[in-house]
């Protein structure tokens, strides 16, 4: 990674203005149901505290549409952070985001203390990347630290704008994300295999196009595999397909051949007579899908084929489920990929899981710890896989 990080700064007495990603899921009572994103920011916060900084944290939470909404207050996050961070002498919260009240709260901070600003999206200027808001935020710190990989693909006042007014460096989480995903794309250990799933091919065209020039094998699953199978002239029954994407699927298959990448499609599938966990189901070859039935998972032969590819790889990136894994009878394919990734890790491969649903699948299977890297950013990891430059990363200072 060719960007400066928090290691490149002498923090003694300095105010570290840190953009974190505390956009955590809350239940109806406003309790945090998964604190992974808070935990992911702890190494950066701890390092700053240990090196004598005053730490000011900013994050968004949910979609409050540019105005204060108690439902999206960062209060529960502050309470959880206090529990997770006993080494902070104090974790304070302010109702302000910018302006005199925020500046006063920052001026009271001592080294070793943490202040959390209120939800940045309570201000309509945040998502507009308003330079005035960015300048107001910059008054609160001496150095800007971006550790919010999950929002690095969005040019907001607190992720990109503020970097124009302060020296800007990456936190450890941002560094880890860019090192793993960027490293895999630019200089992978081979064989390099990617597994791409999810419902729609249209969501992942950019990713597949970018990967075809880099990977040894691309394994396709989920609803998007149906459109590839349709492009090969197969009957998909009542399955989810995107007829308008058939020409794109044909182009991608031709491009794979041209570039010497193997593009693998399911050979058998689990089909059901309705979109329901209670539906009748059976396993058939992809050439024998009857009308009135729909594909909801990859079949056992495909699982074996894909698992063998993953186990023999040295670098694997997985983005998107293999079937409707939220319905138990159609979760086997996605689970098997998670298991094969864990086995590849045990064999010394670099295994990277990126994207919401695959992350959830790995966590449900209890295998997250077995992966080299589980990405915290859905949209951001997708854009990196597409080969795009992320605004929040571009704004950081280059390493010398």
From Swiss-Prot:
Protein name: Phosphoglycerate kinase
EC top class, as a word: transferase
HAMAP family: Phosphoglyc_kinase
SUPFAM superfamilies the UniProt entry points to: Phosphoglycerate kinase
Pfam families for this protein: PGK
Pathway the protein acts in: Carbohydrate degradation; glycolysis; pyruvate from D-glyceraldehyde 3-phosphate: step 2/5
The reaction(s) this protein catalyses: (2R)-3-phosphoglycerate + ATP = (2R)-3-phospho-glyceroyl phosphate + ADP
Keywords of this entry: ATP-binding, Cytoplasm, Glycolysis, Kinase, Nucleotide-binding, Transferase
GO cellular component: cytosol
Protein family membership: Belongs to the phosphoglycerate kinase family.
Enzyme Commission number: 2.7.2.3
Listed PANTHER family: PHOSPHOGLYCERATE KINASE, PHOSPHOGLYCERATE KINASE 1, CHLOROPLASTIC-RELATED
Species annotation: Chloroflexus aggregans (strain MD-66 / DSM 9485)
Record gene name: pgk
GO molecular function terms listed in the Swiss-Prot or TrEMBL record: ADP binding; ATP binding; phosphoglycerate kinase activity
């Amino acid at each position: 990674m060719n960007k400066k990080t928090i290691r490149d700064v002498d923090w003694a007495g300095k105010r570290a203005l840190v953009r974190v990603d505390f956009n955590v899921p809350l239940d109806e009572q406003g309790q945090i149901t998964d604190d992974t994103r808070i935990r992911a920011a702890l190494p950066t916060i701890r390092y700053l505290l240990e090196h004598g900084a005053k730490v000011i944290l900013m994050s968004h939470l949910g979609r409050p549409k540019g105005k204060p909404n108690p439902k999206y207050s960062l209060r529960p996050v502050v309470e959880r952070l206090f529990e997770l961070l006993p080494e902070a002498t104090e974790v304070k919260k302010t109702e302000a985001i910018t302006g005199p009240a925020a500046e006063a709260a920052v001026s009271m901070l001592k080294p070793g203390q943490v202040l959390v600003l209120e939800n940045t999206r309570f201000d309509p200027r945040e998502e507009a990347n308003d330079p005035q808001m960015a300048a107001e935020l910059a008054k609160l710190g001496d150095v800007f630290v971006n550790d919010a990989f999950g929002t690095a693909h969005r040019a907001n006042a607190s992720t990109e704008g503020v970097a124009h007014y302060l020296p800007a460096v990456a936190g450890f989480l941002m560094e880890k994300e860019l090192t793993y995903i960027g490293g895999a794309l630019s200089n992978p250990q081979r064989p390099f295999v990617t597994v791409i799933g999810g419902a729609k091919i249209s969501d992942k065209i950019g990713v597949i196009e970018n990967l075809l020039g880099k990977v040894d094998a691309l394994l396709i699953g989920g609803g998007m595999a149906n459109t590839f199978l349709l492009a090969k002239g197969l009957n998909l029954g009542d399955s989810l397909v995107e007829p308008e994407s058939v020409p794109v699927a044909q182009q991608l298959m031709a491009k794979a051949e041209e570039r010497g990448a193997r593009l693998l499609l399911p050979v058998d599938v689990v089909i059901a007579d309705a979109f329901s966990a209670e539906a009748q189901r059976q396993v058939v070859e992809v050439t024998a899908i009857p009308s009135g039935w729909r594909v909801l998972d990859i079949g056992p032969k495909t699982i074996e084929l894909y698992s063998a590819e993953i186990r023999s790889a040295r670098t694997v990136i997985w983005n998107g489920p293999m079937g409707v894994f939220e319905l138990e009878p159609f979760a086997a394919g996605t689970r098997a990929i998670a298991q094969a990734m864990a086995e590849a890790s045990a064999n010394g491969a670099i295994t990277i899981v990126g994207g919401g649903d695959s992350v959830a699948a790995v966590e449900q299977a209890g295998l997250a710890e077995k992966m080299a890297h589980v990405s915290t950013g859905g949209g951001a990891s997708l854009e990196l896989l597409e080969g795009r430059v992320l605004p929040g990363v571009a704004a950081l200072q280059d390493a010398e």
